[in-house]
């Protein structure tokens, strides 16, 4: 479920103005108790919400807070920084990286990154799925079974 965080959002309730124009008041107590509210709850920010069968939130992701430049030390030698830029409208670009990022989106509470691996025999687009572990003002941690990334925001 996607929408905008409303001004009536409180500690345990998210007011979500959905992309369809409906206004919903969603309990986020379960998500908050399980540390599954990522990026904070700021009015007018774009949000993604994964709902339980009882319409309470399992996971809440502040999409607006994901936007920006995210870098980490190069895992090969640590001497340089690499990463990605997450932009509006699902656009992703690379920062000094061996992969060329193309797109990003949140689907079922996961971050999907589409990229092309430069210099490989296969120049087809690949999609990697990541679990968001943390999202703060200056940090983003994502992981899947094959890799873990701890990014810092580059201003």
Stretch-by-stretch model annotation:
Residues 8-11, 50-57:
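Short, charged beta-turn/beta-strand-edge "cap" motif at the junction between a beta-strand
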Residues 33-49:
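Short nucleic-acid-contacting surface segments enriched for D/E, G, S/T with interspersed K/R
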Residues 1-13:
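Structural detector for short beta-strands of small beta-barrel domains
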Residues 62-79:
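Tryptophan-anchored aromatic micro-motifs
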Residues 21-38:
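Beta-strand/loop nucleic-acid-binding surfaces
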Residues 26-31, 110-134:
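An anionic, turn-rich surface loop/hairpin at beta-sheet edges
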Residues 1, 77-112, 116-123:
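N-terminal glycine/threonine-rich, aromatic-flanked beta-hairpin/loop signature
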């Amino acid at each position: 479920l996607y929408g905008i965080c409303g001004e009536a959002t409180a500690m345990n309730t998210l007011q979500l103005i959905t992309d369809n124009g409906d206004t919903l008041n969603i309990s986020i107590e379960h998500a908050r108790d399980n540390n599954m509210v990522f990026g904070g709850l700021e009015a007018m920010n774009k949000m993604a919400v994964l709902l339980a069968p009882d319409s309470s939130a399992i996971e809440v992701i502040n999409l607006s807070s994901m936007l920006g430049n995210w870098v980490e030390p190069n895992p090969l030698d640590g001497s340089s920084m690499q990463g990605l830029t997450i932009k509006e409208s699902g656009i992703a670009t690379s920062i000094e990286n061996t992969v060329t990022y193309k797109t990003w989106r949140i689907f079922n509470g996961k971050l999907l990154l589409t990229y092309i691996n430069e210099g490989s025999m296969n120049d087809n687009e690949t999609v990697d799925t990541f679990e968001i572990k943390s999202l703060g003002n200056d940090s983003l941690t994502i992981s899947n079974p094959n890799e873990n990334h701890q990014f810092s925001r580059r201003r």
